[in-house]
């Protein structure tokens, strides 16, 4: 059974594998926009140069996830494809974003959110799972050795993303990847 973008429903949890933003942090260093020390660069550069596609995790999600896709253009943009195809809205808790210690140490929180949400090149999976499959999800991805994090939930409403920190709304102006820039 194929994993589609169009199956997310209100009440589903939103999850991602791995950590987000490291590849974008490495690229921003290489482009001269940020300065990383040698250890920081050594930690994040492989995420840009040699990403590990989550093939086994994707296979394990069949029959559990209501929707899924890989994160190549950034979480906000790619999750937007699920929301549009499914006709639903998302709420993302910024405190739940899986950020590596290197990313958290290298930049302020808002910059880390920008890199994680709009940086791209993560090649992790974003997926939605109905409540009744949460227990099976733990087992399936543990068997693959893949770390995953619940970052929010699907809501009824027009496609779009509401960001919160705890319960407080947060307004973000994300600058996503532009293939034609």
What are these regions (language model features)?
Residues 39-81:
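Polyanion-binding loop/helix "lid" in catalytic or ligand-binding cores
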Residues 1-7, 37-38, 87-90:
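Phosphate-handling active-site elements
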Residues 19-20, 33-35, 130-132:
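Short loop segments at secondary-structure junctions
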Residues 25-42, 62:
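Short, compositionally biased
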Residues 63, 68-181:
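Glycine-/charge-enriched secondary-structure boundary and capping motifs
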Residues 1-29, 153:
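Glycine-rich anion-binding loops of enzyme active sites
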Residues 1-7, 17, 49, 58, ...:
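A generic local secondary-structure boundary/capping motif
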């Amino acid at each position: 059974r194929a994993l589609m973008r169009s199956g997310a429903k209100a009440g589903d949890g939103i999850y991602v594998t791995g950590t987000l933003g490291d590849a974008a942090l490495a690229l921003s260093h290489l482009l001269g926009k940020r300065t990383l020390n040698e250890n920081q660069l050594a930690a994040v550069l492989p995420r840009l140069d040699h990403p590990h596609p989550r093939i086994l995790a994707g296979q394990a999600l069949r029959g559990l996830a209501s929707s899924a896709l890989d994160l190549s253009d950034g979480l906000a943009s790619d999750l937007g494809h699920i929301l549009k195809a499914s006709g639903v809205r998302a709420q993302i808790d910024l405190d739940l974003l899986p950020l590596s210690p290197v990313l958290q140490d290298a930049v302020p929180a808002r910059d880390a959110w920008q890199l994680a949400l709009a940086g791209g090149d993560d090649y992790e999976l974003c997926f939605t799972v109905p409540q009744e499959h949460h227990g099976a999800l733990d087992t399936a991805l543990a068997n693959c050795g893949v770390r995953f994090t619940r970052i929010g939930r699907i809501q009824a409403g027009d496609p779009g993303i509401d960001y919160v920190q705890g319960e407080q709304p947060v307004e973000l102006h994300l600058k996503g990847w532009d293939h034609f820039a």
